[in-house]
Swiss-Prot record:
This is DNA translocase FtsK. Belongs to the FtsK/SpoIIIE/SftA family. The keyword Phosphoprotein does not apply. It comes from Chlorobaculum tepidum (strain ATCC 49652 / DSM 12025 / NBRC 103806 / TLS). The chain crosses the membrane at residues 61-81, 89-109, 133-153, 158-178. GO terms for cellular component: plasma membrane. The keyword Nucleotide-binding applies. The lineage of its organism: Bacteria, Pseudomonadati, Chlorobiota, Chlorobiia, Chlorobiales.
Length: 804
């Protein structure tokens, strides 16, 4: 590395006036007295040795393009120093060397003033040879074609990474500038809030001072009344001494008409009139406590290792978080006045029905606020449930969205969810930029949204293990599917997860066609149709996935493990990928195919979890003829968006409440771990953001191994394992080549077929099964390697002829 750095610096320090001294001074005289005599006249900053090196590279070799292979040696040295794989470094060195030779020849053909410095003796010699053999225009065309081919096939990754690095740098620079501006705006806002707060404190101090004055005045009045009462007491309590009439005020005394003697006005009259009566205040009820929301720890996804390598050593780059739009810098506060008015209306309605509330607490979410009401011990929960419609009508808003939870799970309280006046939007970027998503250890992490307490909900699809989504048109189902797929694209490599996309509506999942070389496996007979749109082909695709499930169970049985996690830990070189099947509209498939669709979906839902196959099924008709009892029983995790009626809500969730949602991403999430559904605001991701992500991934180099699912059975088949075994009798087109490869290396493994023949994992496994059935390799024995039963190629050719 140091030699390469020195040589690069010496070449850039080349000076033409140094050349005469270097020509007359051989290498072996660099330490002689003659060298000392000319050392002071050398212009190269690295002295005589640097001048000698620069003249050698520029005049003798390739000119200034000589820097390119020197830079290649520098990169190779860096790989050695960091103990990285040498393959990429050697590949880059070869590219720089070939590119330097081609550029040197091109400059040797040109007539530019600096052609001598840009070509060197070697470049001019190559240029002379090419122009003599194929002529001047042919030489130019050949060198240009070579440069284009080298750049496209060998230097493309470097150029793409460089452009991505530069764009990422400017993106982070822009983000830094925006962050500085946001910080300044925040400081100005805090300063203004401080000024308003101080002004309010001064006003409060003045009001408090006035209140103290009024209190002192009232206290003096009460003392004066007490003194008058003490003076009047002797005259009232002494029976022997009559009340002295002449000692009272000069005004004539009032006479009681019922008696003949005059009666003095008692002193209590003066006590009643002197102090000011306190105003009567209405009953306000318990004070409302506003609970703070969850503060999620933020994390920059771009700080992780964005550049990774797949199992077949293809470089892959995760999409940058900058492809998603930033959330608007909006005020995170809420309308306390609206909350107070809502609380007063709620308590007023409860008082009408003589329901006492001991404590009330409020949690403000992105779109709704949850009022937790702790009732008096004598109040029964059944009374609240019977008043659900009355309370909802009393608290009704123009947009609806009111839901009553009686009781709240784990608390001695009921909950009332009411829309807030200032909803806060939730965007995709805000839920991905959190610590729990960046550093998760889940197999298939998916982001669902934000809860009422502003907590980002991240769950593992592999643990669900399947997800059923239902809701009316426009409620947010398609956006939710985009959110789930985007979560997986930001967290998993192409060799870790694949998608089978079934879109009867033909337009919802169209942007994901660009992922065909990375995340979308091919299905025999449907190679051109990356996203399945035809209902009959959707049935074939689901049956193909069923066969993949059966094949994986065979591999698990041979390896002696129970699930995909144990298999991947034991067979790291032949690790299985997770397979996520997305059906965007189940209702259309059930109407057109009916029983044919229900059967493979049911089999996958019942059995596919252990082998890493998971379903995401969406429908806008949550009726019992679409979501049948068999399907519903095998989907413990469900999402309900806004639906039309309580019946639809009970069909999808087994409880009502989805009919009260707001729409536009407002949803209820139910899983096997929950006793009651949880209200979540689904994040929003636009189609332009989805297009940017898929385009970024689609432009990257494709995987070397093609991923192919098993061939689906005929329409008369039922997808059983017997049909699978019969269909395997038709050999794969790569069967003979795989047999020759295995016999030649005397080694049989799925990873060998993947690397050498560029086959996907599933197809390579099927070919290995066919080799086993043909007697070429032995049966698998757990983690032990298979034995090659055919020892030479002659015996193999004889066996292949007999098989034909």
């Amino acid at each position: 590395m140091l030699a390469a750095l020195f040589s690069i610096a010496a070449v850039f320090g080349f000076h033409a006036e140094d050349e005469p001294y270097i020509v007359t001074l051989p290498w072996y005289e660099l330490f002689s007295s003659a060298a000392k005599a000319v050392a002071g006249t050398i212009h190269n900053p690295f002295g005589l040795f640097g001048a000698r090196v620069s003249v050698f590279f520029i005049r003798v070799l390739l000119g200034y393009p000589s820097v390119m292979p020197l830079f290649g040696f520098l990169v190779l040295g860096w790989h050695l120093f960091r103990a990285k794989p040498l393959g990429p470094g050697l590949f880059f060195l070869v590219y720089t060397l070939l590119m330097a030779l081609d550029l040197s020849a091109m400059f040797g053909l040109s007539m530019l003033p600096l052609a001598d410095l840009m070509s060197g003796a070697t470049g001019r010699m190559m240029a002379s040879f090419l122009s003599t053999v194929i002529g001047y225009p042919g030489a130019w065309a050949l060198t240009a074609i070579i440069a284009a081919v080298l750049t496209f096939y060998m230097g493309r990754d470097f150029i793409v990474d460089t452009i991505a690095g530069v764009s990422g740098f400017f993106g982070k620079l822009l983000a830094t500038v925006q962050a500085i501006r946001a910080e300044r705006h925040r400081k100005r806002r805090e300063k203004e809030e401080m000024r308003v707060r101080k002004k309010a404190e001064r006003m409060a101090a003045v009001l408090e001072k006035e209140q103290r004055k009024r209190d002192k005045k009232a206290q003096r009045a009460r003392k004066a009344g007490d003194a008058s009462k003490q003076k009047a007491a002797p005259f009232e309590n002494s029976p022997e001494t009559p009340a002295p009439v002449m000692d009272v005020e000069p005004a004539p005394p009032l006479l009681n008409p019922a008696v003949s003697e005059p009666v003095v006005i008692p002193a209590e009259v003066e006590e009643i009139r002197t102090p000011e009566p306190a105003p009567v205040r209405p009953e306000e009820g318990p004070e409302m406590i506003i609970k703070p929301g969850v503060q999620e720890a933020e994390a920059d996804l771009d700080e992780r290792a964005l550049k990774v390598r797949t199992h077949d050593h293809v470089k892959y780059r995760f999409p940058s978080i900058d492809l998603l739009r930033r959330p608007k810098d909006e005020d995170e506060s809420y309308d306390e006045r609206h909350l107070a008015e809502t609380k007063d209306r709620l308590l007023e309605k409860l008082r009408i029905y003589k329901i006492d509330v001991i404590r009330i607490a409020t949690t403000v979410g992105p779109r709704v606020a949850l009022f937790e009401l702790e009732l008096a011990p004598e109040v029964k929960i059944s009374r609240i449930k019977s008043l659900e419609n009355d309370l909802a009508m009393a608290m009704a808003s123009s947009s609806g969205g009111i839901r009553i939870i009686a009781p709240i799970p784990g608390k001695n309280a009921i909950g009332v969810e009411i829309p807030i006046s200032k909803p806060r939007p939730v965007v995709m970027r805000s839920v991905l930029q959190v610590e729990k998503f960046k550093n998760n250890s889940m197999a298939l992490p998916i982001v669902l949204g934000k809860s009422i307490s502003n907590e980002v909900i991240v769950d593992d699809l592999a643990a669900m293990p399947h997800l059923l989504i239902a809701g009316a048109t426009g409620a947010g189902k398609s956006v939710a599917i985009n959110v789930l797929l985007t979560s997986l694209l930001y967290s998993k490599k192409p060799d870790e997860v694949k998608f089978v996309l079934i879109d009867p509506k033909r337009v919802e999942l169209k942007p994901y066609k660009l992922l065909k070389d990375h995340f979308l496996p091919k299905i025999p007979g449907m190679e051109e149709q990356i996203i399945v749109t035809d209902p009959q082909k959707a049935v074939s695709a689901l049956r193909s996935v069923v066969r993949e499930m059966e094949h994986r169970y065979e591999l698990l049985e041979q390896c002696g493990v129970r699930n995909i996690g144990e298999y991947n830990r034991k067979m790291k070189d032949e690790a299985m990928f997770y397979l996520v099947v997305v059906v965007d509209e189940l209702a259309d498939l059930m109407i057109t195919a009916g029983r044919e669709v229900e059967e493979p979906i049911t089999r996958l839902a019942q059995m596919a979890r252990a082998v890493g196959i998971h379903l995401i099924v969406a429908t806008q008709r949550p009726s019992v003829d679409i979501i049948t009892g068999i399907i519903k029983a095998n989907f413990p995790s469900r999402i309900a968006f806004q639906v039309a009626s309580k019946v639809d809500s009970r069909t999808i969730l087994d409880v009502s409440g989805a009919e009260q949602l707001l729409g536009s991403g407002d949803m209820l999430f139910q899983s096997a771990k929950m006793s009651k559904p949880q209200r979540i605001q689904c994040p929003y991701i636009s189609l332009s953001e989805v297009d940017a992500i898929t385009e970024f991934i689609g432009q990257q180099p494709p995987l070397r191994a093609e991923c192919m699912l098993p061939e689906p059975p005929s329409s008369s088949g039922n997808g059983s394992s017997s049909g699978f075994d019969q269909d395997r009798g038709r050999r794969d087109s790569m069967f003979e080549e795989a047999a020759r490869l295995v016999v030649m290396h005397q080694q049989a493994s799925v990873s060998l077929l993947q690397r050498r023949l560029r086959l996907g994992f599933s197809r390579a496994g099927r070919v290995m099964d066919q080799l086993e059935q043909s007697g070429i390799v032995s049966a698998g024995d757990g983690s032990k390697p298979r034995e090659v039963l055919v020892k030479n190629e002659d015996s193999l050719e004889l066996l292949l002829r007999n098989l034909d």
